[in-house]
């Protein structure tokens, strides 16, 4: 609940559609940010997948809800850290080693079709060895600057809230698997 207004904000279930009674739900700022432009069914499935992978619930995993990314480059991380005025203390060998490991949040593995990136576990710190974890782009975006505990706690609450929600069986591969950028177009 937003303390200033006394109520949650709102979000569209499917961002491709207009704000209508059928397509609008109450949504806190954290959930709204984490969901981004994802279809609500994908967001709920990702929440269940992560909670299952983390062994916080007995549920299903939906690896198809986490898209593949191949353009993960050391130089882009160096540039991004400099641009955001973050300490960057990783060498290329460490970077190359960490991005081939499974995502610490959802378990997505790097392979010839996908490469994980690097998450700063504590977003208040820079890219130092002790603070870096292998992370897929989708989990990195969802976690954002939230603490790991806040992030998992919110996903757990989402999954509990939607434990009896049946996600649409009519989702086509486009909605299930494509990233935010593609859905926004």
Predicted segment positions?
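Histidine-centered nuclease catalytic patch
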Residues: 1-26, 102-134, 143
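Proteins with a high burden of low-complexity, intrinsically disordered sequence enriched in S/T/G/P/A and R
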Residues: 1-3, 93, 183-184
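Contiguous alpha-helical segments
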Residues: 20, 30, 34-104, 110, ...
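Long C-terminal interaction/binding lobes of large macromolecular proteins
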Residues: 168-184
């Amino acid at each position: 609940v937003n303390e200033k207004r006394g109520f949650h904000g709102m979000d569209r279930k499917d961002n491709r559609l207009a704000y209508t009674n059928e397509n609008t739900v109450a949504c806190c700022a954290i959930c709204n940010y984490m969901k981004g432009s994802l279809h609500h069914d994908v967001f709920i499935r990702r929440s269940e997948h992560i909670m299952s992978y983390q062994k916080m619930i007995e549920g299903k995993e939906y690896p198809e809800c986490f898209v593949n990314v191949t353009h993960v480059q050391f130089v882009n991380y160096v540039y991004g850290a400099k641009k955001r005025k973050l300490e960057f203390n990783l060498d290329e060998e460490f970077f190359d080693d960490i991005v081939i490991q499974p995502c610490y949040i959802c378990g997505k593995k790097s392979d010839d079709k996908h490469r994980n990136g690097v998450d700063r576990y504590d977003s208040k710190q820079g890219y130092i060895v002790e603070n870096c974890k292998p992370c897929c782009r989708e989990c990195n975006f969802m976690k954002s600057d939230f603490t790991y505990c806040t992030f998992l706690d919110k996903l757990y609450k989402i999954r509990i809230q939607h434990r009896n929600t049946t996600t649409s069986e009519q989702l086509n591969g486009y909605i299930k698997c494509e990233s935010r950028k593609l859905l926004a177009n």
